[in-house]
Amino acid sequence: MSEYRRYYIKGGTWFFTVNLRNRRSQLLTTQYQMLRHAIIKVKRDRPFEINAWVVLPEHMHCIWTLPEGDDDFSSRWREIKKQFTHACGLKNIWQPRFWEHAIRNTKDYRHHVDYIYINPVKHGWVKQVSDWPFSTFHRDVARGLYPIDWAGDVTDFSAGERIIS
């Protein structure tokens, strides 16, 4: 069995998928404010830019850009997981790792942001992207980056974490 090695780029932009251990849980959305508080605290102590984020009941996808000269996303994730777990008064709720993908170019970035925003529709939680409250989609609509009806009623969106090129 090969040993997994993470790829680090100082100041890089990354797509992440982070899962709860119990894939039937709804903890991330029922305790969304606790999760949000954990993210804000870690971001205040160890800054990073949130490019896009969606929180689903048992997993989340996001894109971060780290500060110039900084490649340590792992300790930020460790701290977010720790803060949230402690706030919920639970133990052992996360899958041990997370999945990351270094964003390579503008096309790759756009593809992953679209994937993040369509994810609640893909999983059947809502019919339209704008109906999902746990997403930076609404921020990006306010900024004029997406129309409010973007991807409305899309039922088959072909995208994912892994892109082979």
Swiss-Prot record:
Protein name in the entry: REP-associated tyrosine transposase
Activity modulation comment: Cleavage occurs in the presence of magnesium, but is much more pronounced with manganese.
This protein's UniProt keywords: DNA-binding, Manganese, Transposable element, Transposition
GO BP, sorted A to Z: DNA recombination; DNA transposition
SMART domains cross-referenced by the UniProt entry: Y1_Tnp
Subunit structure: Monomer.
Organism: Escherichia coli (strain K12)
Family from the record: Belongs to the transposase 17 family. RAYT subfamily.
